[in-house]
Amino acid sequence: MTLFLPFPLILFILFTLGPAMSEENSLTIHGVTDTLGEDDEQYADALQTAGDVFAEVEALFNDENYESRTGWFKDESNDDGDIVYAKDTSNGRMVTISTELPMPPDFVMKETWEGMETLPEWNQNINFAGVVASPTDNFDIVTYGNNDVLVVSGREFVSARIWRKVDDGYILASRSVKIPSFKSKHKGKVRAHLHIAGARFRPNPANPGTTLTDVVMLAELKGFLPKMIVNQVIGRIMLMDTVTNRSHFRALKEKRDKNAN
């Protein structure tokens, strides 16, 4: 038996089904479209997850209450003037910090994005780090693990990252994803869940050549850690990473300045 469909109906089906299939494999944010090739279609869900978390991170940074820290409380601080603010959410404690990095935003963004695999070389809290897949220039899948920090044993993360140039700066966002084809090489490490991680890099009008940096994070560490313990240490861990990150960029600036002479 021959199945016949009128040509107008065929066009209707192609029109309705075709775009829906392609939309799953592409994402447009701020006029830039990430499109997955055939070999990377397994990352379609991760791409959409990255888009979701980017929207959340951008909305958070643009919220006037974030700028004034309304609804946040002072969690940790140090003698350098760094302050970690926190707020409790249904998914756990969210923490944020703002700092100045001694390099311009273009450099900071490039180093943050491309320097993933070198993290263990200069960050004592990182045990391993690598790129699982890099389907587009603005979207990738990464894995990393931290060493034992304070009372928290090492955790492993697998997350999608995405970035965009926004105005004269950048926004980078990340969230944990499940990649069926990914097999961890680090047995025994608890797989933590990154609900939201984001960074905003902006030029500093008061100090040209430097970058105003805002970082926000909300992670569920899993395992058998009591919530009270997690809340006590998560801000301190962010503070430690901020100091380490700033020292890293200072070293890169010194190297750049030395090579320029």
Identify the meaning behind each predicted range.
Residues 4-6, 13-261:
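Eukaryotic helix-grip
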